[in-house]
Each structure stands twice: as C-alpha cells, then as structure tokens.
Amino acid sequence: MTVLSHASAPKPLAGVRVLDLSRVLAGPWAGQMLADYGADVIKVERPGVGDDTRTWGPPWWGEGEERVAAYFLCANRGKRSIAIDIASSDGIAQIKQLVVEADVLIENYKVGQLAKYGLDAPSLQKLNPRLIYCSITGYGQEGPLSHKAGYDFAIQAEAGLMSVTGEKGGEPQKVGVAVTDLMTGVYATTAILAALYERNTTGKGRHIDASLFDVQVAMLANQASNELVGHTHPTRMGNAHPNIVPYQVFPTRDGHMVLAVGNDGQFERFCLAAGHPEIAADPAYKTNPARVKNRETLVPMLTAWMMQRDTAEWGHLLDNASVPCSPILDVEQVMTHPHLLARGMKLTSSDPAVPPMIAQPMLMDGQRLTSELVPPALEIGRAHV
C-alpha cells in the first residue's frame, strides 16, 4: 500500500475501528477525518457500483474500468473498501458480524431505512452496547421534515444560507463548495470523538443524530444572532459584511482584492498607509459602529483610493502596515501557492498510480494528521477486514 505520510505521524485514534456505510460527502468526510486521526475505517459499498461519487466525473484519475472520479478521492483517504449488499440476508449477517468488533458506525440512509434490515441503532447496540452509531440525514431523526431526503444545495436554500449569499438585490447564490455537507461531517466527527471519550467512563455507546439542516442553521452564526437579537432580517450584501466596515472586496487598478479591517486600530493604519489619516480621525468613521452606520459614504471613498494602485502594490503597502488584506486567487493559483507548499498541504507521490491530494489541515507537534492509505478501489481491503 502506497504511503502518503510518515509512519511516525500521530495516530491518536489507533485501535478504533469505524464502519463507514455512508455515501457522497458528509458521512465520508467524517470517516476520512477519523482515518486521518488513526482509526481503522472500513468503507462498506454497494457490490459492483460502490459510492455514487466514484462516477461523479470528469475529471478522472486512472483509465478504463479502474478510473475513479476526483470527487471520490477528496473524501475517502485512509479507508479500506468492502462490498456488501445490505438488503440481502448474507449482507445483513456480515454487517452484524463487523459491528461486534466495531467502535463507530456512520450511516446516511433515510430515516427508518436501515431498521427494515435490523441495522438501526437500537438493534446493533444490542449486539454491541459500546457501539457509537452516527446517523447523518438532511433533516434529522425527528421533526416534520425528517422523512425528506436532504442534499447540500437544498439545505443551503432552506436553512437560510442562500438568503444571505449573493449580490445585494440580486438572485440568491449557493456557496462554491458543499459547505453544509462538509461542516456536517466536521460536527459529526466532533460528536463521535466526544462519545468515544465519554465511553471510557460509561462503557456505553451513543446514537448521534447529525442533521444537515441543524448544522446549517448553526452555521448562520452572527447572522442568526443578528436576527434573534435585533430582528435585522439579514439579506444579501454581496461581499460586504453586516457588522464590520470596511470588510469586503474592492476594485484595484488591475483587478480586485479583499480588505478585511477588523478593528479601529487597523482602520487607522489603513488610512495612514493610504495617505488619508484625517478620515480615521473623523467621528463619522473613527469607530466600527460609526463606519457601519455611514458605510454608504465611506465605501465609495475607499473605492476611489483603492483604484489608484495595483493589487500587488496595495498588498505590499498594507502588509507592512499590518492591515489584513488578500489578493483573490483562483483554485489553480492556490494549488501552487508557496505557502501551501511550505505547509505541506499538497500531497504528491513518486508513484504515478497515486493521485495528488490535499492533506488533513491539522498538525500535532509539527506533523500532519494524514493517513498513509490512498482512497481505495472497490473491495480493496476485504481480505484484511
């Protein structure tokens, strides 16, 4: 098996076995995180087909029948694959046999579907009371919408994210990646880790109910709090911020860049660097609440300043003044960014059969928490399960 990371990399979850019955992104993302932390993750897939995302291409890695979509590669590092038909009596028996030795099970079937096969949490926890069973669904195990299938795009719409994303007065927009799926995977992982820690004391597992809808509502963060506290009815503001000014995209002489002024000291330094210190002293703009109140007069003024210099010139000037700012890079530029390469966030191998990948973003004592196993071909690992 090809190595992606050093064998000495930390494996805090070594000895933990995970059955990953999930498909697509939210569940597999949680399984990959646990694998990166050292868990033994067994991906249970449909015979002959596998995870839906294996065919979500192009682009593809490999050729012919062995090719796999890049989408699948992003969420299945560190796993072994086994094909089981969970609707068959033999498949049900295999799952139950694996559950006896498992610590965690992750699934994202519709509510009640696995109960038809005796693979629901109560049934499997009778076989293994220590089992931590994580159910990931669109709307949760209970509630008036629990029966509905949930996809990231639909949840972004129904849970409020699209109402605050997009240009002011324009159409609602989804985010460029499936953030609701991804964050549900992260939240599910933290709940699983909490349950594993608790089990050290209680000796018992838990049934975790992870809902994309709940996660997306929680992710509204300050926008939800603004509505609950101030009844502000948050709306789309383009790249501006409802609570901070200036904190948005500005045009420059040769393009665009982000100016992210988070406090009054930074605003004062920005005005000084721009050659207009008197604006920072003006009571209409001196404090953030004043700038929020007067954004309609301030932002056009700053726009005129920003258009007088190139993006790189502003970057050099503001970096030296300790004013947060950034160029706007595309994904291709990010993949070759010197900082990304210096941090070891891009995994490559001298083996031409191994696809390039993005590493797990966490380090412990300077080492990446990244599994050494590449995403598996269908059924790779069955002999060792």
Predicted feature residues:
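Conserved Rossmann-fold dehydrogenase catalytic segment
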Residues: 141, 169-178, 200-216, 235-242, ...
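Oxidoreductase and adenylate-handling cofactor-binding alpha/beta cores
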Residues: 185-206, 218-229, 271-278
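Aromatic-enriched alpha-helical interface/lid elements that frame and gate functional surfaces
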Residues: 245-321, 325
